[in-house]
A protein has these predicted regions:
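Adenosine-nucleotide cofactor-binding segment
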Residues: 36-116
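Alpha-helix termination/capping residues and helix-transition junctions
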Residues: 9-12, 57, 103, 176
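Short, contiguous clusters of charged residues that form electrostatic/catalytic patches at enzyme active sites
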Residues: 1-5, 91-95, 116, 165-168
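Short internal alpha-helix immediately C-terminal to a glycine-rich phosphate-binding loop
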Residues: 1-38, 96
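Glycine-rich phosphate-binding loop and adjacent beta-alpha segment
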Residues: 38, 46, 55-56, 74-78, ...
Length: 181
């Protein structure tokens, strides 16, 4: 909850686009539902096409299968041939996102895999947007091309579930049956 509503000025609003890693898992499916409740557009990243219907049923606008791309893991040394290959795939992934956002970069990236996805998250979030992270399920050694961070004024924000007020707000959504835990 805090990841999407607790880090001003990057607070989820109607019409915003949010990329959600692991959209069929516990954290991801919760984030998809929060986006739907807020009127935002969740683009869920999945690892298997069999998970698409579930993610869409939770309220995602679209899904993208990460296995169709090869831009995962720690970022290769900048300007190396491996880096250039990585960036070609990251651009391809960004274009796949644009197919669902009318050519716009995402406002927020809901990040929890960490090591395998952070470089791509920082690349695809919009200028002035936020990558918000609450875990490192694929590892804790985060790499990125810092030029995309400072030249495009992006924010990387650490987070966790919620403070007492935010927990109460999240619980209220469940009591109102607007979220399915």
């Amino acid at each position: 909850y805090r990841m999407l509503f607790g880090h001003r000025p990057h607070v989820l609003r109607p019409g915003q686009n949010v990329l959600i890693w692991g959209a069929s898992g516990g954290l991801g499916s919760y984030a998809v539902q929060l986006c739907a409740v807020a009127g935002a557009n969740a683009i869920g990243v999945i690892s298997d096409d069999s998970k698409a219907d579930f993610v869409l049923s939770m309220g995602a606008k679209a899904v993208i299968n990460r296995n169709n791309f090869k831009c995962w893991g720690q970022l290769p040394k900048v300007n190396s041939p491996e880096f250039n290959d990585y960036m070609k795939e990251a651009r391809k992934f960004g274009k796949a996102i644009w197919q669902h956002t009318n050519g716009k970069d995402v406002d927020i990236v809901f990040e929890h895999p960490g090591e395998s996805t952070m470089p791509t998250s920082v690349f695809v979030v919009k200028r002035g947007g936020m990558v918000v992270i609450c875990a490192g399920t694929t590892g804790f050694n985060l790499t990125m091309d810092a030029r995309f961070l400072w030249m495009r004024q992006k924010r990387v924000q650490g987070s966790h579930f919620a403070n007492l007020l935010q927990a109460s707000q999240a619980n209220q959504l469940m009591l109102e049956r607007r979220l399915d835990p």
